[in-house]
Amino acid sequence: MPTNGLHQVLKIQFGLVNDTDRYLTAESFGFKVNASAPSLKRKQTWVLEPDPGQGTAVLLRSSHLGRYLSAEEDGRVACEAEQPGRDCRFLVLPQPDGRWVLRSEPHGRFFGGTEDQLSCFATAVSPAELWTVHLAIHPQAHLLSVSRRRYVHLCPREDEMAADGDKPWGVDALLTLIFRSRRYCLKSCDSRYLRSDGRLVWEPEPRACYTLEFKAGKLAFKDCDGHYLAPVGPAGTLKAGRNTRPGKDELFDLEESHPQVVLVAANHRYVSVRQGVNVSANQDDELDHETFLMQIDQETKKCTFYSSTGGYWTLVTHGGIHATATQVSANTMFEMEWRGRRVALKASNGRYVCMKKNGQLAAISDFVGKDEEFTLKLINRPILVLRGLDGFVCHHRGSNQLDTNRSVYDVFHLSFSDGAYRIRGRDGGFWYTGSHGSVCSDGERAEDFVFEFRERGRLAIRARSGKYLRGGASGLLRADADAPAGTALWEY
């Protein structure tokens, strides 16, 4: 497969939570650090970088400031260094319960404290020097085995997860990381959890919880017995092996999970590449040849469609659409026009893609009618995590409303309904819009919401009122935005 941004390893960003459940924060004023924040936002986000030398020391860089954490000999800490010096070198010492201890490499003292009383002067580790790692990236991704160069996916027939996919195609390749009790669970697309013996279980039991470790920018998952997940045997079954130290077999990359979609034309048949290079609406079944990976260009907001056969849709002579391009170009870009529950696609020749009488697609129309409208269905988010500008969407304690500014997230279930989606929460209740634009999550009857894919990795959600869902100043989810922009766009 060509690169073209299809396989992008996620830069691991995280927060560090102390023993009093407060996040390590880098302040712009005076470049001071504290542990006062109750949730994970921009100021609480950090990146681990390897030290330029050959040792085991690491650097902690604030994503917010772009500066490095440092500890002086007298224990004073700051986040002021634009270039990493000797005082910026730390050793990460993972503890049996999964938490980290940070020790200054040049001075040998431990970093910790509470509120604005942080220092790196402790000679022994107490609870104040223990830090929990909380990933700051969107938790839905693909998992790539570093040693086998194969993607992890659910194998329903064998009832296991295996690292044997040469590409992350279809819903089975989606994994959701669930953060609970200072550890992480791996949740499959059918909402089961991976246990360390390779079994899939419905509850996040202790043997299905893992400690995250970082090594050279890669991830390792350590189980409660101190062993690491790895692909095992010819099938690459994912389970805890015998190793108590992470080697290449135990390392994984997290990759961005782009939306994969199917399109249905006016003849009620699926758009497909099953019968060759022509893109045609001529299939009754929804399989790999009918599934397309959709990417949106951040600058132009136009999209590309990549097929399972290894080619992008591209405009050819006489307006034809073939799935043969190996590189992104102007001819592979399509402008999306959202028309209620349907979408129209405009090609680089300025004409709309339509379905011809023989089912083939061609960009030959000047206007949009039924033959130019398609139903677009997202297939690789049966479970959904939403993040806005202020945080994740999560149920509001003691209420039927939804918060939009949380550092923890709820996992919602999606079902498709003729160009729209129904969203179901943790207790089985459906989302619906109430009075004055409020969005509630305890409905007995489902309301249809339209998803509009507006930017790379972000969508807008339109309620039946025609208004878009946004994160309000109160921190509650509301359906009162007029335009799909800003706080009305959601990372998914």
Curated annotation (Swiss-Prot):
This is Fascin-2. Localized specifically in the outer and inner segments of the photoreceptor cells in the retina. Belongs to the fascin family. GO terms for molecular function: actin binding; actin filament binding; protein-macromolecule adaptor activity. Its main location: cytoplasm. Gene3D superfamilies: 2.80.10.50. It comes from the Eukaryota. Acts as an actin bundling protein. May play a pivotal role in photoreceptor cell-specific events, such as disk morphogenesis. InterPro entries: Actin-crosslinking, Fascin, Fascin-like_dom, Fascin_metazoans. It is linked to Retinitis pigmentosa 30: A retinal dystrophy belonging to the group of pigmentary retinopathies. Retinitis pigmentosa is characterized by retinal pigment deposits visible on fundus examination and primary loss of rod photoreceptor cells followed by secondary loss of cone photoreceptors. Patients typically have night vision blindness and loss of midperipheral visual field. As their condition progresses, they lose their far peripheral visual field and eventually central vision as well.
